[in-house]
Swiss-Prot record:
Organism of this sequence: Influenza A virus (strain A/India/6263/1980 H1N1)
Keyword terms, alphabetized: Calcium, Disulfide bond, Glycoprotein, Glycosidase, Host cell membrane, Host membrane, Hydrolase, Membrane, Metal-binding, Signal-anchor, Transmembrane, Transmembrane helix, Virion
Subunit structure: Homotetramer.
Family as reported in the entry's similarity comment: Belongs to the glycosyl hydrolase 34 family.
Region of interest (Involved in apical transport and lipid raft association), residue spans: 11-33
Protein name: Neuraminidase
A GO biological-process term: viral budding from plasma membrane
Superkingdom per UniProt: Viruses
Annotated catalytic residues: 151 (proton donor/acceptor), 402 (nucleophile)
Main location: virion
Annotated catalysed reactions: Hydrolysis of alpha-(2->3)-, alpha-(2->6)-, alpha-(2->8)- glycosidic linkages of terminal sialic acid residues in oligosaccharides, glycoproteins, glycolipids, colominic acid and synthetic substrates
Subcellular location: Virion membrane; Host apical cell membrane
């Protein structure tokens, strides 16, 4: 074979190899395109995602693609369409209270990253229930937990997490800078109210869906404060009560009507012989009922009810089963303040059923220990101390604290009535437990049911002191 023939042969072989390679590459491209079409052709991109989602440590894996989604809760099988929570249903008939949640946050916080908190409360939308709380800007078992017995500081903030979970940096959502707060959902968005600032010039910041919409300046310059539990939404309007003035004498009390975060009306209560603090409010047949704390001179609880025009009535629970702490032994009640052991108090709640009342209270008369629910069938209007039902929730030997009401609307439960619920704060640490350098709490909650319930104790259960305390 001469040199020219060798060159032609080698060139032909190279060209053949190149053509084969090109054909293989084209086949590879076609196969990838066909495979992609098969995978995506049948998907409806506007519908609900049917992929399997596995959540671990606040991160989401979707088809082996890592996506970090912070503070996002996927509510499976729920229609997320906005609604208007009517709030016009009556309270559900109940026979007792079923345990609903327990977060065990102090126990978990001995080893995990859990916020130092107080004043937890629960509020529900038509899709979910969340625990709100006032953090101290510190974690349990950390040096910044020192001195957190203080109520008001610039480090406190209103945050929220899914109900039943220990509040941590990994599952909690920031809501507002606050040392006093309230929150509620109207079916379309969350309203949050956070009060912060100096005692003589605090300001309440209103947010709707996370955006500042309004502010309220302290009008008496005496520690503006609000409910420390959920506000109430009825037919698109939300209602809250604020107090400004002395904690041991007559103060100023205002009701605010709020729509999408904007104040549309407010009134001041004419109640010179009453004292209203830290009200626990709920809707009932289109009206709002609030049961509050008298820190001035009442060992029974004051109440105020009002309609959507803010026409109101006031009074005190008449029952001789007294609901505040400290309080005297049960006996002769009054529809006015019962002044025996009436000074000081603790946030609490009651539910009215006609002339009857479910009273939530500490088991101890003098300290924040234990908790029980009592059904007094005539206690709203009569002054005797007779009752029919007592359900134990926390034993006398275990610490409790604040308590408050929240409801589950029919839009959430599917019932034709408003389900009454309540939460109890289980305070640990200072000032009572002096082996610690901190003050914090966990929480439990219960909901009313018309079926069997248990008498038991669901205490905080943490073993103190922690490592930081030694």
């Amino acid at each position: 074979m001469n040199p020219n023939q060798k060159i032609i042969t080698i060139g032909s072989i190279c060209m053949a190899i190149g053509i084969i390679s090109l054909i293989l590459q084209m086949g590879n491209i076609i196969s990838i395109w066909v495979s992609h079409s098969i995978q995506t052709g049948s998907q409806n991109h506007t519908g609900i995602c049917n992929q399997r989602i596995i959540t671990y440590e606040n991160s989401t894996w979707v088809n082996q693609t890592y996506v970090n989604i912070n503070n996002t809760n996927v509510v499976a099988g729920k229609d997320t369409t906005s609604v208007t929570l009517a709030g016009n249903s009556s309270l559900c008939p109940i026979r007792g209270w079923a345990i609903y949640s327990k977060d065990n946050s102090i126990r978990i916080g001995s080893k995990g990253d859990v916020f130092v908190i107080r004043e937890p409360f629960i509020s529900c939308s038509h899709l979910e229930c969340r625990t709100f709380f006032l953090t101290q800007g510190a974690l349990l078992n950390d040096k910044h937990s020192n001195g957190t017995v203080k109520d008001r500081s610039p480090y406190r903030a209103l945050m929220s997490c899914p109900i039943g979970e220990a509040p941590s940096p990994y599952n909690s959502r920031f809501e507002s800078v606050a040392w006093s707060a309230s929150a509620c959902h109207d079916g379309m968005g969350w309203l949050t109210i956070g009060i912060s600032g100096p005692d003589d010039g605090a300001v309440a910041v209103l947010k709707y869906n996370g955006i500042i919409t309004e502010t309220i300046k302290s009008w008496r310059k005496r520690i503006l404060r609000t409910q420390e539990s959920e506000c109430v939404c009825v037919n698109g309007s939300c209602f809250t009560i604020m107090t400004d003035g002395p904690s041991n004498g007559p103060a100023s009390y205002r009701i605010f009507k709020i729509e999408k975060g904007k104040i549309t009306k407010s009134i001041e209560l004419d109640a010179p012989n009453s004292h209203y603090e830290e009200c626990s409010c709920y809707p009932d047949t289109g009206t709002v009922m609030c049961v509050c704390r008298d820190n001035w001179h009442g060992s029974n609880r004051p109440w105020v009810s009002f309609n959507q025009n803010l026409d109101y009535q006031i009074g005190y629970i008449c029952s001789g089963v007294f609901g505040d702490n400290p309080r005297p032994k049960d006996g002769k009640g009054s529809c006015d303040p019962v002044t025996v052991d009436g000074a000081d108090g603790v946030k609490g709640f009651s539910y009215r059923y006609g002339n009857g009342v479910w009273i939530g209270r500490t088991k101890s008369n003098s300290s924040r220990k234990g908790f029980e629910m009592i059904w007094d069938p005539n206690g709203w209007t009569d002054t005797d101390s007779n009752f029919l039902v007592k359900q134990d929730v926390v034993a006398m030997t275990d610490w409790s604290g604040y308590s408050g009401s929240f409801v589950q609307h029919p839009e959430l439960t599917g019932l034709d009535c408003m389900r009454p619920c309540f939460w109890v704060e289980l305070i640990r640490g200072r000032p009572r437990e002096k082996t610690t350098i901190w003050t914090s709490g966990s929480s439990i909650s219960f909901c009313g049911v018309n079926s069997d319930t248990a008498n038991w104790s669901w205490p905080d259960g943490a073993e103190l002191p922690f490592t930081i305390d030694k």
